[in-house]
């Protein structure tokens, strides 16, 4: 696991507190738009919103003194893939309301986001989760704010959504080929396939927020996020 700044373990006494802090496992952060992958997968899995449906994201969402807007407003109706490709906060927030806060929270729990990562070290950060999972909470969580988790937790959850749909708890130990891997089915193969395709578009589409990662000769998929 990479964590910067790092230190020379042969000279531990010369290291700083910051260098010894494991950013990958102990640090918890608001992951930002990376969470839109999870919101998208949950929407598909629960049939809250389909691939062929569109939703209007022309106007910012205003709730009390809060305002949800997009960095590059599209001012039109968009599909689920467009919400992900263009990283729309407005679209993700609308989709979260179709999913519902209780369902969203349930999936976040299945994806290991509500408890520390079950790693074989003491350096595991405790996620900062909402005390109450309200409609506004669901909106902000849909685009990765209002909840803070570790990098390793995020990697495991995204692997489930964009892999084969199974959640596999992260480990630092080499797995024995003779012992079956414990896995939990969170998303169907169809949902995972659709999410993979959309993550590819984030990188391959000329307007995708991740097009800088489109390397010739490789099928790269991903999702940008501002932590």
Task: State what each model feature region is.
Residues 1-33, 38-227:
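Beta-lactam-recognizing serine transpeptidase/beta-lactamase-like catalytic domain environment
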């Amino acid at each position: 696991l990479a964590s910067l700044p790092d230190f020379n373990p042969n000279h531990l006494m010369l290291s700083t507190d910051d260098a010894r802090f494991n950013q990958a496992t102990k640090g918890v952060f608001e992951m930002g738009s990376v969470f839109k992958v999870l919101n998208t997968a949950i929407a598909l899995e629960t049939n809250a919103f389909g691939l062929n449906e569109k939703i209007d994201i022309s106007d910012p969402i205003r709730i009390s003194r809060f305002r949800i807007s997009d960095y590059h407003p599209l001012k039109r109706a968009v599909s689920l893939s467009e919400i992900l490709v263009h990283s729309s906060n407005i679209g993700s927030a609308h989709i979260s309301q179709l999913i519902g806060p209780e369902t969203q929270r349930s999936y976040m729990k299945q994806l290991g986001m509500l408890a520390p990562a079950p790693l074989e070290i003491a350096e595991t950060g405790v996620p900062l989760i909402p005390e109450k999972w309200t409609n506004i909470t669901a909106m902000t969580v849909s685009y990765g704010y209002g909840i803070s988790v570790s990098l390793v937790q995020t990697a495991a959850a995204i692997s489930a959504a964009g892999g084969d749909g199974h959640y596999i708890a992260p480990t630092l130990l080499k797995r024995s080929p003779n012992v079956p891997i414990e896995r939990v089915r969170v998303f169907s193969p169809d949902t995972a396939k659709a999410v993979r395709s959309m993550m590819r578009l984030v990188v391959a589409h000329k307007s995708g927020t991740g097009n800088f990662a489109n390397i010739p000769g490789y099928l790269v998929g991903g999702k940008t996020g501002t932590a």
